[in-house]
């Protein structure tokens, strides 16, 4: 059992390392969104050094007039590269460490979802591998550099699979809650897309739910929990 688990961990790390190979080249590829996201990370680092936390307005942006990018674009996950910058890493190294962790998260997320649904190890490993080398991931990291959108891809499978499992079973939808919490703190548009997909799934199952008060209670509790956890993002945005 332990040997099998060790092999799985080694496999996941090896596949992630293979996908990470383009990052071993010197420099940062300048995709369409690269200037924006690099500026977010660097300005977040500068704001933290000024003692500002949490950072909603990045003071060094917009010719040092400040720009409220953190109000509409969640900064939660780019605190990691920003803190690495504070620790003395270059912007390039900070971004590449973040990207490696992001690739690992993408694999583990899809692996976990498929394993949870099927109970099988090898299909889950295959799904994780295919997901890591899928066009949205490769394009988001190595071409367009849409880091926030790619970060959301970590939580999209959790949200959708969480909804599927919640429809099928009378269990608390913790996967659904984690998925939407991560989506909200990653990318607002991806959250909206996931909401639409989950709503469609809910509508088709509605006739089966009418008399199930426990299921509605679980769903409302999950919605309230996610809303409370993510209020630091959507509260200032709505204001």
Predicted segment positions?
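Membrane-embedded transmembrane-helix bundle of lipid-linked glycan/lipid transferases
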Residues: 1-239
């Amino acid at each position: 059992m332990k040997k099998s688990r060790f092999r799985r961990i080694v496999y996941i790390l090896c596949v992630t390392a293979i996908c990470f190979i383009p990052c071993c080249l010197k420099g940062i590829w300048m995709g369409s969104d690269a200037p924006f996201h690099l500026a977010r990370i660097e300005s977040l680092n500068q704001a933290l050094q000024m003692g500002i936390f949490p950072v909603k307005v990045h003071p060094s942006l917009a010719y040092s007039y400040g720009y409220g990018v953190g109000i509409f674009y969640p900064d939660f996950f780019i605190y990691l590269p920003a803190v690495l910058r504070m620790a003395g890493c270059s912007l390039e190294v900070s971004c590449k460490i973040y990207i490696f962790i992001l690739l690992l998260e993408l694999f583990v997320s899809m692996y976990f979802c498929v394993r949870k649904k099927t109970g099988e190890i090898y299909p889950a490993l295959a799904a994780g591998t295919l997901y890591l080398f899928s066009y949205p991931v490769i394009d988001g990291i190595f071409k367009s550099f849409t880091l926030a959108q790619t970060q959301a891809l970590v939580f999209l499978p959790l949200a959708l699979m969480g909804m599927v499992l919640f429809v099928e079973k009378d269990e608390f939808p913790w996967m659904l809650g984690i998925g939407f919490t991560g989506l909200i703190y990653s990318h607002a548009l991806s959250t909206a897309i996931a909401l639409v997909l989950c709503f469609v799934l809910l509508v088709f199952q509605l006739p089966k739910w009418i008399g199930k008060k426990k299921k509605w209670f679980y769903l409302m509790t999950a919605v309230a929990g996610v809303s409370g956890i993510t209020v630091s993002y959507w509260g200032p945005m709505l204001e």
